[in-house]
Swiss-Prot record:
Subunit organization: Homodimer.
Organism: Chromobacterium violaceum (strain ATCC 12472 / DSM 30191 / JCM 1249 / CCUG 213 / NBRC 12614 / NCIMB 9131 / NCTC 9757 / MK)
GO molecular function terms noted in the UniProt entry: magnesium ion binding; manganese ion binding; NAD+ diphosphatase activity; NADH pyrophosphatase activity; RNA NAD-cap (NMN-forming) hydrolase activity; zinc ion binding
Reaction it catalyzes: a 5'-end NAD(+)-phospho-ribonucleoside in mRNA + H2O = a 5'-end phospho-adenosine-phospho-ribonucleoside in mRNA + beta-nicotinamide D-ribonucleotide + 2 H(+); NAD(+) + H2O = beta-nicotinamide D-ribonucleotide + AMP + 2 H(+); NADH + H2O = reduced beta-nicotinamide D-ribonucleotide + AMP + 2 H(+)
Residues reported to bind substrate: 76, 132, 200-207, 249
Protein's UniProt name: NAD-capped RNA hydrolase NudC
Residues holding a divalent metal cation 3: 182, 186, 227
Names of required cofactors: Mg(2+); Mn(2+); Zn(2+)
Residue ranges occupied by any Nudix hydrolase domain in the UniProt entry: 133-256
């Protein structure tokens, strides 16, 4: 189990700290440190659970950055730098931090929200509304046609980078319906034989990505104006630049390539 969620830390276990300074996360030797920066004032300290045998804590730096070993990195570069085993811990901390910062007042009556002692949610002492960390489900689909994969790029992607199709689930919509809708809207293609692959919590800012592989079922590629800059079919031995290795898109594309090669063997 990646996370255990007791109410109190286990005193016999070591610690891991996610200390933020604005949009920056503090790392030591490219890892989440075992203790916060020495001699620094912290705010928002919170126990987030047990992850990989360590008590996980969240805090924000108050004042200037400490002049000591380590570096402050934006979240994406920090996730790339740290061991894969710690990525999920940092993602949890980033998502909960965003929730704590954005849910300070009741959206119903504007009363300051109270922190719950036994859960991560916050409640309104005036009207009784309860707020929990937001999770936004989104699907990702990799469309296969023989040994070719349909990859696309959005205008905000790094130059030369392509990825699988993705989009948020609409209210009242199933994941499967979202896959069919997004592939049609984004590239004008129909799909069939959907297969669930895996999922990933993605803290930009609070997505839960659910990845699928689907087979091509017709249609000519027609990139959606304003959303898709380019799209095309790519042979698995001639892929363009791909998303960073920690992303579910990278894992999904590599997984599909491996499956195709296994079938060809």
């Amino acid at each position: 189990m990646p996370f255990e969620l007791p109410q109190q830390p286990a005193p016999e276990l070591p610690e891991r700290w996610c200390v933020f300074n604005g949009s920056l996360l503090w790392l030591q030797d490219n890892q989440l440190p075992a203790q916060p920066p020495a001699g620094c004032a912290l705010t928002g300290q919170r126990f987030l659970g047990i992850h990989e045998g360590s008590n996980l804590f969240l805090a924000d730096l108050v004042g200037d950055m400490p002049a000591q070993a380590g570096e402050w990195l934006p979240l994406r570069p920090a996730l790339l730098a740290m061991p894969m085993a710690q990525v999920q811990a940092a993602a949890r901390a980033a998502q909960l931090r965003q929730f704590f910062h954005s849910h300070r007042f009741c959206g119903h009556c504007a009363t300051p929200l109270a922190v719950s002692a036994d859960q991560l949610g916050r409640h309104c002492p005036s009207c009784g509304q309860v707020y929990y960390p937001r999770i936004s489900p989104a699907m990702m689909v990799l469309v296969r046609r023989g040994r070719e994969l349909l990859l696309a790029r959005s205008p905000h992607f790094a130059p030369g980078m392509y990825s699988a199709l993705a989009g948020f689930v609409e209210p009242g919509e199933t994941l499967e319906e979202c896959v069919h809708r997004e592939t049609w809207e984004e590239v004008g293609v129909k799909v069939k034989n959907l297969r669930y692959a895996f999922s990933q919590s993605w803290p930009f800012p609070h997505s839960l990505m659910l990845a699928f592989i689907a087979e091509y079922d017709g249609g000519d590629i027609r990139p959606q104006e304003g959303e898709i800059e380019d799209a095309g079919w790519f042979d698995i031995d001639a892929l363009p630049g791909l998303p960073m290795p920690i992303s579910i898109a990278h894992r999904l594309i590599r997984h599909a390539c491996d499956r195709i090669r296994d079938l060809e063997a």
